[in-house]
Regions:
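Loop/turn elements at helix/coil->beta-strand transitions in domains of secreted/extracellular proteins
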Residues: 15-19, 51-56, 116-119, 156-162, ...
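Non-catalytic terminal accessory segments
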Residues: 15, 176-178, 257-387
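Active-site environment of divalent metal-dependent phosphoester hydrolases
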Residues: 27-30, 58-69, 129-131, 167-174, ...
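N-terminal active-site segment of His-dependent metallophosphoesterases
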Residues: 1-37
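Conserved beta-sheet core of the metallophosphoesterase superfamily
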Residues: 55, 179-274
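Extended active-site neighborhood of metal-dependent phosphoesterases/phosphodiesterases
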Residues: 37-152, 228
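Divalent metal-coordination and catalytic microenvironments
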Residues: 3, 25, 61, 123, ...
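Active-site-proximal segments of metal-dependent phosphoesterases and phosphodiesterases across multiple
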Residues: 127-147, 155-207, 211
Length: 387
């Protein structure tokens, strides 16, 4: 019922959008293998009926495998079934002629968008997560192969670019703030691939990067101190399983591929309503430089933060508070563990760094030493008592 009402709300707001972007996690956590493909196909069919002229962009998420989270192997049956269902929507009017050939391999494709000179590079970056494992097939060298594929496309694709994927680079704010309580800085991607990826985007004129995964509305800025900061939009989820209100975004696209008038539509009190957008934060054009300015204003002006928190959780009570605010603010521009730690001026280590491994090893050695000492003490005590 929630899904149907969301589709109807999208149609009401824009009956004939040129582009519809779906940033992954079509499926629920722990969905059965039996239901995975029919669900992904049914979503494509429903959206096709709702928007028969729109060009679709689909990036797969960590749930989208049919055999568990972070588990999709290349050339899987799931990929072939999704390609068959979504291909007519994505390759509308020949916009993505190589889609069927490349998507069935690892979720990658490129597309021409209906703005002059604008192209999209779409890929499955779940392979780059430290949690990735091929549970329903052979992973092979998919991590390196997919990364090389994206880098080649960045070099070869002309004009203004959108890059679309599911997992954002940088820090997992929810896990860092609420699960580990700052004791561990949790990364979304393998640090080596994260650094390589963000460097690649910094070297190319990227009009927009789009990610999902967090279920919340937010932004990131790659290379915020460089001459061409890259704006990244994090899209919210229709599913409310992380305490968010169900939500989706609408935006206008300019001639250079940047966004304007990004608005959040949220399901509140039984109806879908516009709860505002980036203009409530003083941002009209969603560009790298505008986001750098917004980042500075949010850091200096605490009275602006409630507006961001409202958008972040689509109008639901926010997980962000005065104490953990630095985690969410710093994550927008500080992607590595050391820059993030310096920004928050707090402790914490990452398990995926040398320091993290050394810390874990140190804790394990201490535990082992205590266990050995207690065991020896108990043995001596038993001998003294003649047991």
């Amino acid at each position: 019922m929630l899904w149907e009402s969301a589709v109807h709300a999208m149609q009401r707001i824009d009956p004939d959008p040129p582009v519809v972007v779906v940033n992954g996690d079509l499926l629920a956590h722990s969905i059965s293998r039996r239901d995975a493909i029919p669900t992904a196909v049914a979503i494509a069919q429903r959206l096709d009926r709702a928007f028969p002229h729109a060009q679709f962009i689909l990036a797969l998420g960590n749930n989208d495998s049919g055999c568990g989270d972070y588990a999709l192997a290349p050339d899987a049956t799931f990929l072939r079934a999704v390609a068959a269902a979504w291909g007519p929507l994505i390759n509308r009017r020949g916009a993505a002629p190589g889609f069927m050939r490349t998507f069935v391999r690892d979720g990658f494709y490129t597309a021409t968008l209906p703005v002059a000179g604008l192209h999209a590079i779409v890929f499955d970056d779940v392979y780059w997560s430290p949690r990735y494992h091929a549970a329903c097939g052979k992973g092979g060298n998919v991590v390196n192969a997919s990364f090389t594929e994206v880098e080649s496309a960045l070099r070869a694709t002309p004009g203004h670019l959108w890059v679309l994927f599911h997992i954002p680079p940088g820090v997992d704010t929810f896990s860092t703030a609420l699960i580990s309580k700052r004791t561990v800085i949790v990364p979304f991607m393998r640090p080596d691939l994260r650094d390589r990826f963000t460097a690649d985007l910094s070297d190319k004129h990227i009009a927009l990067a789009v990610a999902g995964h967090t279920h919340k509305f937010a932004y990131r800025v790659i290379d915020a101190t460089g001459p061409n900061p890259v704006p990244m939009l994090l899209v919210p989820a229709i599913s409310p399983i992380f305490g968010n209100k169900p939500a989706f975004l609408t935006a206008d696209v300019t001639g250079d591929g940047s966004l304007r008038h990004v608005e959040v539509t949220s399901f509140k009190r039984g109806r879908w309503i516009d709860i505002g957008g980036m203009r409530s934060l003083g941002v009209d054009a969603f560009t790298g430089k505008a986001l750098v300015d917004l980042q500075a204003r949010l850091g200096a002006n605490p009275s602006l933060r409630p507006a961001f928190e409202r958008l972040y959780n689509a109008g639901a009570p926010s997980e962000i508070n005065e104490r953990n605010w630095p985690i969410y603010w710093c994550a927008a521009t500080a992607f590595g563990t050391t820059p993030f730690r310096n920004c928050t001026q707090a402790g914490g280590f990452s398990f995926i760094t040398q320091r993290g491994l050394e810390a874990v090893a140190g804790v394990l050695l201490i535990v082992v030493a205590i266990v050995v000492a207690v065991d020896r003490w108990q043995r001596r005590r038993r001998r003294r008592l003649g047991l």
